[in-house]
Amino acid sequence: METFILSSDSDDDSGPPPSKRRTIEGIPRSFSGDKKIRFSFGASNMSQDTTQEIIPEDTDTVPLTIPSTPALSGKFDSKTPKSVRRRSVSMSCFTPIVETINQPPTNQACSSFLQKEYNFHDLSSDEEGGDGGAGCSKDEDKIIEDNLNLRALLSPEKKKRKEKIEEVQNEFYGVYCLISRSDRPCYKNRCYIGYTVDPNRRIMQHNGGRDKGGAKKTDSRGPWDMVCVVHGFPNHVAALHFEWAWQNPLVSKSLKEKQLRKERKETPFAFQLRIACELMNSSAFCRFALTFRWLITTEELPFPTSCVPPDHTKLRFGKVKKEMSLVPSKREDYLEMGECRICGKDIEKLWSLVRCISATCPSHFHSKCLSENGLKLKNEHVDHVYPLKANCPTCGQFYLWGDIIREQRRIIKISTKCAEEFQNMVVRKELPHREISPISSKK
């Protein structure tokens, strides 16, 4: 580290003046030997006979002279601007600044890095003047390597973030039944019916109270257990209709003619189970591809013999797992919409496309063409708009119409998240899905 000595002409008048002297006004120009050190002073109106020198040690360069600090007790020229006066007064702090420059750096790694960088620049300049920079020795390679290593220590690069994998959650619309486990007799074994898109999150909200997002009717009446859930609705509107009819069986259009009442020896949950089975058999919901799931298997009850759920209703056990579908970013993961295998016309809109649920069948259809084909096979085209179940006209695979619509909505949802160039294309079937298991809640 080079040091600088600050001297004044007024202290040494006997000696001969330096060979070359330059008075600095404002910002000095760069000169060879100043080692890129700059000082800025506003001393345009100061006397030029009082100057100070900055003489680098062990150098043959011309000393740098700067104006000396005027006495603070003296008066400034009235024509001197205030900004210049401030800068002139601030020059009284010049000596401690130079002393700070002379202090060695606290970080030894920084010190060695700066010294090696300086030596490396000198070597490179010598070679350019000598042999034209032809080849580097092993010592120079080592200097370059140390230079890069130290530079990494001084300014480490930020870690690159991992590319975020785009996913969409498969739609889930469910209507559930809760049972109260309260110690108070007035609330014990009471039931509550609700709608949710995430049963595992919803039960925690109910047990957390209204502050956590629970319902008013479940606040301070728990803890609650989510015993069963009915899901597989094509959209949230159908699920909300099912919820309201389950909550109000005496006034709903689907069940008011039956006037369902709780029997004397029937538990509250057994009565709610009977209402759910009646709803699944009603004309409004019997053609949906629904699933009845027992979330707590120890609470399972036999279905009432008078109203067993329809044959196509699936029965499942265990907690619901979130299903995530990958949104691919490569061209080979998408297919063209192509033409309808029934009418032979091109499919122009993605929302009008449906496809077979078989993993090996590549057929695409218009939703209207496939529904009419299924209705004709079952002779239901007079009374219904869409079939309950049918077979694929290409491969013969059995399907439920609710599964066809659920796959169509998944394709549309992926198209809204993918790149713009793939929005009018169909994602492949064999792409991997991801399931998120629910976290077991501690009671």
From Swiss-Prot:
Residues 171-258 form the GIY-YIG domain. It holds the Pfam family SLX1_C. Disruption phenotype: Reduced brood size, increased embryonic lethality and increased larval arrest. Increased number of rad51 foci in meitotic and mitotic nuclei and increased germ cell apoptosis. Hypersensitivity to ultraviolet C, nitrogen mustard and camptothecin but not to gamma irradiation. Increased chromosomal abnormalities including increased intra- and inter-bivalent chromatin bridges. Increased meiotic crossover frequency in the center of chromosomes III, IV, V and X with decreased frequency in the arm regions of chromosomes III, IV, V and X. Its main location: nucleus. InterPro entries: GIY-YIG_endonuc, GIY-YIG_endonuc_sf, Slx1, SLX1_C, SLX1_endonuclease, Znf_PHD, Znf_RING/FYVE/PHD. GO terms for molecular function: 5'-flap endonuclease activity; enzyme binding; zinc ion binding. GO terms for biological process: double-strand break repair via homologous recombination; embryo development ending in birth or egg hatching; interstrand cross-link repair; larval development; meiotic chromosome separation; meiotic DNA double-strand break processing; negative regulation of nematode larval development; positive regulation of embryonic development. Its EC number is 3.1.-.-. Coiled coil: none annotated. It is an enzyme of class 3 (hydrolase). GO terms for cellular component: Slx1-Slx4 complex. PROSITE patterns: GIY_YIG. It is found in: Nucleus. Keywords: DNA damage, DNA recombination, DNA repair, Endonuclease, Hydrolase, Metal-binding, Nuclease, Nucleus, Zinc, Zinc-finger. Belongs to the SLX1 family. Both the N- and C-terminal regions are required for interaction with him-18. Catalytic subunit of a heterodimeric structure-specific endonuclease that resolves DNA secondary structures generated during DNA repair and recombination. Has endonuclease activity towards branched DNA substrates, introducing single-strand cuts in duplex DNA close to junctions with ss-DNA (Potential). Has a preference for replication forks over 5' flap structures or Holliday junctions and shows much lower activity toward 3' flap structures. Required for proper crossover distribution through inhibition of crossover formation at the central region of chromosomes. This is Structure-specific endonuclease subunit SLX1 homolog. It comes from Caenorhabditis elegans.
